[in-house]
């Protein structure tokens, strides 16, 4: 008969951390991911954005009124690396107000499967 997996004897989060999470809705775990890994993820995200042709679509991501603003690009993005702009990224003529690197709200959704840098990071045992 296989033995049961070991149980943690101490909580993963302290009482103060749980309280902060309940109060704020998020928790910052300082030092959980080494700075060098964060730098690599930021650099790769920048490379992906630079390589993205902003003329191919103008999909805006917002959590407000998402049902109305969800488009086919968003709905078809589950198996791709897709880019979504900030609300207000475009002027009345449809031109970006600032460089695309400063206009992206979200990169989604499959970079953890399709990009080797995000894949390596996302599959670390510490994140499970």
Name each model feature, range by range.
Residues 2-22, 30-128:
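Non-heme Fe(II)-dependent double-stranded beta-helix
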């Amino acid at each position: 008969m296989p033995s049961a997996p070991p149980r943690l004897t101490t909580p993963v989060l302290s009482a103060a951390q749980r309280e902060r999470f309940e109060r704020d809705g998020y928790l910052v775990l300082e030092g959980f991911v080494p700075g060098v890994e964060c730098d690599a993820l930021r650099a790769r995200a920048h490379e992906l954005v630079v390589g993205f042709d902003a003329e191919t679509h103008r999909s805006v991501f917002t959590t407000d009124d998402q049902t109305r603003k969800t488009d086919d690009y968003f709905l078809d993005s589950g198996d791709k690396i897709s880019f979504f702009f900030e609300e207000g990224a475009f002027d009345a003529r449809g031109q970006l107000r600032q460089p695309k690197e400063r206009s992206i709200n979200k990169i989604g959704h499959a970079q953890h499967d399709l990009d080797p840098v995000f894949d390596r990071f996302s599959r670390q045992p510490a994140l499970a």
